């Protein structure tokens, strides 16, 4: 395995994508806009598309309103009132952490849109915002289950048709290569579905490699695979390796709560330099050799009660184990949340979150968040605001695109299937459980701290050799009928995601944002650019200057 060559032409490395005429399905629908994914970004996209009068279908891998990281827990929100000084401070606060790869114009756009939507969530969605002691309404965080319950109600009232437990398996394109819908499988009814649409919004989440973090069982990089199969590019994939702190006996990751913690070696001595924001690497290195313990200090009784009310599921595992985290030490681990709290994803080329493929839009964790955060987020706040904003922009734009096609063209154009790896093998189909081996190979290269957190050229090349061999194997034989097709596609998506991640990581020979190179520990000003990547059988990487998206699209 050799390092990716730079630069490489994007157009010359796009894979051929239209491989088969799409077959009719058990459930065959048409819509103006299809949204893939039912989390915050997906529901905002569906809502805003429907408000324009568009006919909208939303397909969720789980049950829309209860599946995914946000619905399972909750999150902070990057909500800053329209005060110039406050917003300048909020934007400047993360510039260095993100490696100066963000775009201030986009950050201001996100703050504007998030402010508007959070006001709307209370006034029109009935969300019960809490009040501060002085009576001010506090909109800096949402209780996930309540937030997503209300989002489901809102899109239903707007006329959106929801397909629950209906994972998408592939995108559809027309004869020109424009995205024209998607196809998938309804798990509970055990039947196929197809939606022919004027435009598609990818809001399927990022990739956490089935690490066990709460709510991340449905985010396996599917959207990135779908996008690559139709020729879209990815951006910031080297920034897809975020590890979050959790109690050893818990799947709940709450960085803000652990900011109140003190960390200890296994022998009880203080772990110097450890912290949930600046100092997680210290914890990760220690975990390579010993157990690490934490205790939530510096929290008064009133704050303890507030924390329990705000995120009760954080404390449930402690209660079950008879541990008071405020007075007792407890063992911790770090769970990979990959691009969920990272910034890598599908490349965006316009202000309305269009991709480079006509008819395809990306929102939330499916899309790159470099424009807002550069190479580091570290938590839900910025990503939550991005989900709200990008979903809004993508939903409205998808509706406009569909209207521009005209109803007749939208309904009558022939469509072609694009799914390859895990659906249509190039050789003899393998064992029905082959996906299990493929998943474990991907997890084995993506999860370990010494491979993905503390990166070196040698270790990344070794991982890529293993992943490339696995990709060749799955392209040749991986497939499964009916409900199991979801598993084979997840296996293919995680393998592809890891290959893109390490290929971009090899190309960035410096430490910037969350991308840490043991062999290149310093930031290199000469590498102040973003990295685009893509390709399926042959992965490519090329640098992109840091400049506004509107300029990139012109």
Located regions from the model:
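Glycine-rich FAD pyrophosphate-binding loop
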Residues: 51-72
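Long, amphipathic alpha-helical stalk/connector segments used for oligomerization, subunit docking
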Residues: 401-484
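N-terminal Rossmann-like FAD-binding beta1-loop-alpha1 element of flavoenzymes
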Residues: 33-58
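Glycine-rich loop(s) and the adjacent beta-strand/alpha-helix scaffold that form part
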Residues: 199-251, 370, 374-397
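Core beta-strand elements of the Rossmann-like FAD/NAD(P) dinucleotide-binding domain
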Residues: 28-31, 189-199, 356-357
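Glycine-rich active-site loop/strand segments that organize a redox cofactor
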Residues: 78-110
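Mobile, glycine/GP-rich and aromatic-enriched active-site lid/loop segments adjacent to catalytic centers
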Residues: 3-6, 115-116, 121-169, 238-378, ...
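Extreme N-terminal leader/targeting segments of oxidoreductases
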Residues: 1-33
């Amino acid at each position: 395995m050799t390092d990716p060559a730079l630069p490489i032409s994007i157009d010359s490395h796009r894979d051929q994508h239209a491989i088969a005429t799409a077959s009719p399905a058990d459930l065959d629908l048409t819509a103006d806009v299809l949204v893939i994914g039912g989390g915050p970004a997906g529901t905002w996209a569906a809502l805003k598309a429907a408000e324009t009068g568009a006919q909208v279908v939303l397909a969720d891998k789980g049950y829309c309103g209860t599946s995914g990281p946000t619905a399972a827990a909750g999150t902070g929100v990057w909500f800053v009132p329209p005060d110039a000084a406050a917003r300048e401070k909020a934007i400047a606060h993360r510039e260095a952490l993100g490696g100066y790869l963000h775009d201030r114009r986009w950050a201001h756009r996100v703050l504007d849109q998030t402010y508007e939507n959070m006001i709307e969530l209370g006034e029109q969605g009935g969300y019960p915002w809490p009040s501060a002691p002085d009576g001010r309404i506090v909109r800096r965080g949402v209780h996930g289950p309540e937030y997503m319950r209300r989002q489901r109600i809102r899109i239903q009232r707007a006329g959106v048709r929801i397909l629950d437990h209906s994972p998408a398996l592939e995108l559809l394109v027309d004869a020109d290569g424009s995205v024209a819908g998607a196809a998938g499988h309804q798990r509970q009814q055990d039947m196929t579905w197809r939606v022919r649409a004027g435009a598609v919004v990818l809001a399927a989440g990022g990739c956490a490699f089935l690490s066990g973090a709460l709510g991340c069982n449905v985010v396996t990089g599917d959207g990135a695979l779908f996008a690559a199969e139709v020729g879209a590019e990815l951006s910031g994939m080297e920034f897809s390796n975020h590890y979050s702190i959790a109690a050893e006996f818990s799947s709940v990751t709450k960085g803000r709560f652990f900011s109140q913690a003190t960390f200890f070696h296994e022998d009880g001595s203080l772990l110097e330099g450890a912290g949930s924001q600046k100092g997680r690497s210290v914890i990760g290195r220690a975990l390579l050799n010993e157990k690490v313990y934490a205790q939530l200090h510096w929290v008064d009784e009133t704050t303890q009660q507030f924390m329990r009310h705000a995120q009760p599921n954080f404390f449930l595992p402690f209660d079950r184990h008879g541990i008071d985290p405020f007075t007792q030490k407890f063992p911790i681990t770090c769970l990979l949340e990959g691009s969920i709290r990272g910034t890598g994803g599908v490349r965006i080329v316009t202000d309305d979150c269009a991709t480079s493929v006509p008819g395809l839009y990306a929102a939330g964790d499916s899309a790159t968040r470099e424009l807002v955060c550069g190479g580091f987020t570290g938590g839900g706040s910025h990503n939550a605001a991005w989900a709200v904003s990008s979903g809004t922009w993508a939903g409205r734009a998808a509706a406009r695109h569909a209207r521009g096609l005209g109803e007749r063209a939208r309904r009558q154009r022939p469509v072609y299937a694009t799914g390859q790896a895990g659906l249509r093998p190039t050789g003899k189909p393998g064992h029905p459980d082959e996906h299990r081996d493929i998943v474990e190979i991907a997890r084995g290269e993506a999860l370990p701290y010494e491979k993905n957190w503390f990166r070196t050229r040698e270790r990344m090349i070794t991982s890529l050799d293993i992943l490339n061999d696995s990709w060749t194997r799955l392209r040749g034989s991986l497939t499964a009928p009916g409900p199991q097709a979801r598993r084979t596609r997840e296996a293919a998506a995680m393998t592809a995601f890891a290959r893109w991640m390490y290929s971009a990581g090899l190309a960035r020979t410096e430490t910037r944002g969350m991308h840490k190179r043991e062999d290149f520990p310093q930031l290199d000003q000469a590498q102040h650019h973003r990295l685009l990547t893509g390709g399926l059988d042959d992965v490519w990487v090329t640098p992109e200057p840091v400049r506004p998206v509107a300029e990139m699209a012109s």
